Amino acid sequence: MSRVNPADLNLTDRVVHISRVAKVVKGGRRFSFSALIVVGDGCGYVGYGLGKANEVPEAIRKGVEQAKKNLIKVPVNQNQTIPFEIEGKFGAGRLLMKPASAGTGVIAGGAARAIFEAAGINNILSKCLGSNNPHNVVKAAFAGLQRLKSPEELAARRGITE
């Protein structure tokens, strides 16, 4: 898979989850933050990143930088949905994604909704099965979306021409 140049895309970023973590040291607790970020151009390109820092804005900035390095292309058809049903898995998290007819909207939970909207998928049905941890849901969604191929790609792979 070829690497995508983020400078060529008009990317918008979205914070999926921010968590405060504590490291217990001799003098007490030292707090830092981790931010899970999703970036996308609304036309099929989407990526996610995890940034960690002592301050929230710095964690978000680091997450955006990492997300720009993890961009993938998602095949979106003319109904602004995915071509076929697929399930993504990561750890204990599973995300079932089904194509929806035009006008349905994004039927998804928080973490999955952010990904679909960033990718420009406006009609989709999804269900989180197993873990609802935002990290697992995001990674499961990406695992499923990476496996998606457009109908043209599948036809070419199978040697079918119309």
UniProtKB/Swiss-Prot annotation:
What GO MF annotations does this protein's record show?
rRNA binding; structural constituent of ribosome
The UniProt keywords, alphabetically, are: Ribonucleoprotein, Ribosomal protein, RNA-binding, rRNA-binding
Entry's InterPro entries?
Ribosomal_Su5_D2-typ_SF, Ribosomal_uS5, Ribosomal_uS5_bac-type, Ribosomal_uS5_C, Ribosomal_uS5_N, Ribosomal_uS5_N_CS, Ribsml_uS5_D2-typ_fold_subgr
One biological process GO term for this chain? translation
Question: Could you confirm whether the keyword Ligase appears in this record?
Answer: no
Q: Which domain of life is it from?
A: Bacteria
Membrane-spanning parts = none
- Asked whether the UniProt record includes Cell wall biogenesis/degradation among its keywords, one would answer no
Gene Ontology CC entries for this record? small ribosomal subunit
Chain ranges of the S5 DRBM domain: 11-74
Q: How does it assemble?
A: Part of the 30S ribosomal subunit. Contacts proteins S4 and S8.
The entry's function note states: With S4 and S12 plays an important role in translational accuracy. Located at the back of the 30S subunit body where it stabilizes the conformation of the head with respect to the body.
Query: Could you give the domain comment from the record?
Result: The N-terminal domain interacts with the head of the 30S subunit; the C-terminal domain interacts with the body and contacts protein S4. The interaction surface between S4 and S5 is involved in control of translational fidelity.
Assigned protein family = Belongs to the universal ribosomal protein uS5 family.
| NCBIfam families for this protein | rpsE_bact
> Protein name, please?
Small ribosomal subunit protein uS5
**Encoding gene (name):** rpsE
